[in-house]
Design a protein with these regions (language model features):
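Non-heme Fe(II) oxygenase metal-center motifs and adjacent flexible, charged/small-residue loops
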Residues: 1-203
């Protein structure tokens, strides 16, 4: 089911009863001033554009990433092993806010920097073994509004769409990752920078 704060989550009003999908969306969870300050500071971290192999061919990921977390935490996705850099106060502040809203504990965060409309992330689920059987994912958006889409794993059926805006918090509760895929598609319209933080617990 969906819980939505302040406005309708999806363009389709009938989605409140989606099976095996539990998503909470808090619009403007971070005030405009807070979101501006966080975005300004997060731009300064050491971003990296990783190289991945798709069907035997090397490609640069269409976004930049950074990985932070507790000591010793590592995470593998798209064939890349990420070793966490230590938390710093600004990230700690955001983590506390997300933990309070979600009721979950997070020991790491993956940051994605979408530089413009040419950056995105393909269909996927955050269901790697390191995340445990029933992960909760806390996703914070700063910067440009971008489309967020969702569809069932079991069939290539209807795609459900919303936009995530500056300061929004989206929480994907279990069992969402087991049954649904999500993506941030590249945009046909010119966009500016967006930074997304996805908090998670590595077990």
């Amino acid at each position: 089911y969906f819980f939505v704060n302040q406005e309708s989550f999806w363009q389709n009003d009938e989605l409140s009863d989606l099976e095996n999908c539990h998503i909470s969306l808090y619009r403007n969870h971070f005030s405009e001033n807070e979101a501006d300050r966080y975005l300004s500071n997060l731009k300064k971290i050491n971003w990296k554009q990783n190289e991945i192999v798709v069907f035997g061919t090397k490609h640069l990921e269409p976004r930049e990433t950074a990985w932070f977390g507790d000591s010793g935490v590592s995470y593998k996705y798209s064939g890349i092993v990420h070793k966490a850099k230590p938390w710093f106060p600004l990230l700690e502040d955001i983590r506390v806010r997300v933990q309070v809203a979600s009721g979950a504990i997070f020991n790491s965060v993956l940051l994605n920097r979408y530089r413009d409309e040419n950056d995105g992330v393909a269909w996927h689920a955050d269901d790697e073994p390191e995340l445990g059987a029933f992960p909760t994912i806390g996703s914070v958006s700063f910067g440009a509004s971008r489309k967020f889409q969702l569809r069932e794993k079991s069939r290539k059926g209807e795609i459900f769409t919303t936009f995530l805006h500056h300061g929004d918090l989206l929480i994907m509760h279990p069992p969402t990752q087991q049954h649904w895929l999500h993506c941030v598609p590249k945009s046909r319209k010119k966009t500016t920078e967006r930074i997304n933080l996805t908090f998670r617990e590595i077990v």
